[in-house]
Amino acid sequence: MQSPEFLSASSRLTVDLTALADNWRAMNERSGKARAAAVLKADAYGLGVVHAAPALYAAGARDFFVASVEEGADLRPLVPDGRIYILAGMWPGNEELFFENDLVPIINSEEQLAVFMAALSERGDHPCVLHVDTGMNRLGLSPEEALALAHDPARPASFSPVLVMSHLACADDPGHPMNRYQLQRFREVTAAFEGVPASLANSGGVFLGADYHFDLTRPGIAVYGGEAVNGAVNPMKAVVTAEARIVQVRTVPSGGTASYGASVRFGRDSRIATVAIGYADGYHRSVSGGGVTLRQAMPSGAFGFLHGMKVPHVGRVTMDLSLFDVTDLPEAAVRAGDYIEVFGRNVVIDDVARAGGTIGYELLTSLGRRYHRTYVGGA
């Protein structure tokens, strides 16, 4: 039975934890001999790490990646014996958080390596990960720096990484030559760290095949139901559904206009549903389609789903409200108080993102605080 708050909310978000767990299991299986971690940064991609982490742990995940040491400290009580990796690494002043919470810093630079080694000299042994940049040019030691470290006879015995990793720049495009280039560079580095486990594949990398799996894969967006490979059928289950209440239904005569700037003109008598969702809720203004000047050259706008039919968004997304054309639905079927699915099982979040010229990651992590959130299922 749904709560009164769910039934009366202006907008609501339903997170299917069973689908989340199933997606992780599917990625773990696709990883073959490697084991799959789970990426939980940005509050589990906006869905709530307090709920997502226990579900993934119950499904079998034991390795977790987050962005910052603060995220790691918050995650620790949720996965007591999990290994938590911190992508941003260790900096002067936050060393104690790593030791207190048993967090694994990812070493991205020689400067961070120096901070880590100084911390070891004061506090004793602690695991770390060596991040090598193989072409992304964002974070990581260069392959040359990593190889020099591997062959340095003066390297302290206390420096013993538990993982060597890199990050693929073009894994969502299986045919991109950068994938093979990065794989080759990574193999050159891992050969110098004989016996140290290795990790290269993100979500898209898992789909590239066994050559990219090594010992640990790092699926992120795929676990949350998003597309990992451009142009391919997405095999993952939808995890999140966003719905918003119809506040009012209006009739606009043929030739009439609606929204800011009179940005949409109707060629027939039309019925328009005003819906309680806007860019303050992470429903980006750019999904308006041609109703926004800078979008004139981009695809048409997004759709919603109501009573078994897709209904087009019209006009401009505003802070709190959006308009959907419900003319093709029976008049008696659409009433104020009904809910339109904005994305979920029937409206793919990546399609909404494409309509806005962005990606599903950005929509998920932009979700505002006004949704009534409901978590269903589990591992």
Curated annotation (Swiss-Prot):
EC assignment: 5.1.1.1
An example molecular function term from Gene Ontology annotations: alanine racemase activity
Record-listed substrate binding positions: R138, M319
Enzyme superclass (EC): isomerase
GO cellular component terms given for this protein: cytosol
Residue positions of the active site: K41 (proton acceptor), Y260 (proton acceptor)
One Pfam family named in its UniProt record: Ala_racemase_N
Catalyzed reactions per annotation: L-alanine = D-alanine
A single BP term in Gene Ontology: D-alanine biosynthetic process
Pathway: Amino-acid biosynthesis; D-alanine biosynthesis; D-alanine from L-alanine: step 1/1
Keywords: Isomerase, Pyridoxal phosphate
Modified residues (N6-(pyridoxal phosphate)lysine): K41
Cofactors required: pyridoxal 5'-phosphate
Protein task: Catalyzes the interconversion of L-alanine and D-alanine. May also act on other amino acids.
Family membership: Belongs to the alanine racemase family.
UniProt cross-references to HAMAP family, sorted A to Z: Ala_racemase
Protein name: Alanine racemase
